[in-house]
Amino acid sequence: MKGLYQAAGRILVTLGILSVCSGVIAFFPVFSYKPWFTGWSVRIACPIWNGALAITTGVLLLLAYREWTQRYLGEATFTFVILSIMGCPLHFAIALESALLGPYCFYSFSGIAGTNYLGYAVTFPYPYAKFPLACVDPPHYEEYHLTLQALDLCLSFTLLCTSLTVFIKLSARLIQNGHINMQLPAGNPNPFSP
């Protein structure tokens, strides 16, 4: 059982870092240095904030495992696991919506009446194979966009599964003992045994 909490903490930290990196990379489309390509949107901010929640949850879980006598670490872990569970479906929904609508093209459909979103100009879901060169600048933006959204879908689902596992184990301990941190019986060195 002790390996479960360590593994879950490490998984949450690793996937949280990947999620933050995904949001930061999405900030600069196709690694472009052109400042007019940068911009905040809900698609970029959601992976960053969900990744920050996962990193915080993972670090608290690892610290709670290491210093199990500190009651506040277990309670903070439980709180952040709940927040992470609430953020993961939102992250998943935004990534799915973004993948289905298509990429945000900066110059393809812009203008006086343009919306900049290909999702409003082409059929739904976005036909990546039939309409490969809709975004003229930056090049290969469709593939870049689809790869980032697929990565976000996988990250959000894995973060949700890991957070749910930790939540279920901590909830079982809370129901069984009346609190998250348990008193150790004499001779039991493992604070995380059920």
UniProtKB/Swiss-Prot annotation:
Domain of life assignment: Eukaryota
Location of the protein in the cell: Membrane
Membrane topology: Multi-pass membrane protein
Disulphides: none
Transmembrane segments: 11-31, 44-64, 76-96, 99-119, 148-168
Any Gene Ontology CC annotation: membrane
Keyword Membrane part of the UniProt annotation: yes
Keywords: Membrane, Transmembrane, Transmembrane helix
Cytoplasm in keyword set: no
UniProt protein name: Transmembrane protein 212
Source organism of this protein record: Homo sapiens
Source taxonomy: Eukaryota, Metazoa, Chordata, Craniata, Vertebrata
Gene encoding the protein: TMEM212
